[in-house]
């Protein structure tokens, strides 16, 4: 995408945003529980967040509050079946939770603060994308969950672009447009992400 084209799309989207009303949002804080962070990151793809994902994340936070680090979560998975911990039966998702947990443990990532710093290194992101089921959206979502500034382009954000008359964008193109819009509006990436997500989730 050329710089001129990016600026044109971003300006178009800014103008569209200014015709809408959005609920106020505050900066998201990490869970400070890697089991919850990993579970949220893996389950969010393709599932209803409020009805399916967050209740399971909350279950981990409440019932296994002492198992905060990546190592703790791996130990927890040795003590109880993961299907019971998460209360979820999809074997593919459960295996991805295991895979991501071991990957982060093997890379010395034990908490969200370490994860935030680790995700700032480009070569680490390249390694992370080699884990089965981890694509650019999950990487960006992990950045958000760790407290970093990021925007994770999901179906809601793609649909919002379509509403603004901007269609057929790749993930990277949409990411560039939204990043430019956040800069133009002088708001954080997370704030832009959350405002649009909440707006579209009500539709």
Name each model-derived stretch:
Residues 36-48, 98-102, 194-199:
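Short, hydrophobic/amphipathic alpha-helical patches that form generic packing surfaces
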Residues 42, 171-203:
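A basic, often C-terminal nucleic-acid-binding module that engages the phosphate backbone, implemented
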Residues 45-55, 104-111, 201-203:
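Short helix-capping/linker segments at secondary-structure and domain boundaries
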Residues 59-130:
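Alpha-helical ds-nucleic-acid-binding substructure associated with the helix-hairpin-helix region
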Residues 41-43, 119-165:
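Catalytic DNA-binding helix-loop module of base-excision-repair DNA glycosylases/AP lyases
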Residues 52-55, 92, 152, 169, ...:
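Alpha-helix N-cap and coil->helix boundary residues
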Residues 54-58, 91-98, 125, 136-143, ...:
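Short, well-structured alpha-helical segments
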């Amino acid at each position: 995408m050329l710089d001129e084209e990016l600026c044109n799309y971003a300006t178009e989207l800014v103008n569209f945003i200014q015709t809408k009303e959005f609920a106020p949002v505050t900066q998201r804080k990490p869970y400070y529980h890697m089991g919850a962070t990993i579970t949220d990151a893996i389950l969010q793809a393709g599932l209803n967040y409020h009805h399916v994902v967050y209740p399971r994340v909350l279950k981990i936070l409440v019932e296994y509050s002492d198992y905060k680090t990546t190592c703790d979560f791996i130990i927890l998975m040795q003590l109880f079946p993961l299907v019971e911990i998460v209360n979820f039966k999809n074997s593919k998702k459960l295996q991805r939770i295991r895979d991501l947990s071991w990957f982060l443990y093997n890379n010395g990532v034990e908490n969200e603060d370490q994860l935030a710093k680790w995700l700032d290194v480009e070569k680490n992101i390249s390694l992370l994308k080699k884990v089965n089921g981890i694509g650019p959206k999950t990487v960006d979502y992990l950045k958000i969950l760790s407290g970093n500034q990021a925007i994770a382009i999901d179906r809601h954000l793609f649909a919002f672009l379509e509403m603004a008359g901007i269609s057929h964008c790749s993930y990277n193109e949409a990411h560039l447009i939204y990043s430019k819009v956040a800069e133009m509006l002088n708001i954080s990436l997370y704030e832009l992400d959350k405002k649009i997500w909440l707006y579209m989730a009500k539709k």
